[in-house]
């Protein structure tokens, strides 16, 4: 007998949301890398993407191990860039009247 459990669904970005996030990132930082190879890892964010359109995006953290790896070292200097990016996405999507 073989027991088989489906774990996480595929994490599939919505093209429109991915493009929007990349455009805002470029406006905030002046550059964006959209030429990364797809990853085969599981991510619980995929459940959210099954319910609503969106995009799972990497901010960039320099030359370190991936998140959840014991050797991962978060680069605190990325915080202002990430904060500015998220704030600009919110302000662009929901501008003040």
What are these regions (language model features)?
Residues 1-97:
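Metal-dependent amide/peptide-bond hydrolase catalytic core
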């Amino acid at each position: 007998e073989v027991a088989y459990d489906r774990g996480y669904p595929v994490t599939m970005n919505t093209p429109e949301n991915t493009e929007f996030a990349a455009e805002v990132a470029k406006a905030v930082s002046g550059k964006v890398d959209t030429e990364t190879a797809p990853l085969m890892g599981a991510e619980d964010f995929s459940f959210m993407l099954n319910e609503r359109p969106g995009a799972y995006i990497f901010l960039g953290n320099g030359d370190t191990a991936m998140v959840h790896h014991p050797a991962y070292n978060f680069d605190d200097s990325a915080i202002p860039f990430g904060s500015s990016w998220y704030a600009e996405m919110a302000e662009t999507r929901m501008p003040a009247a």
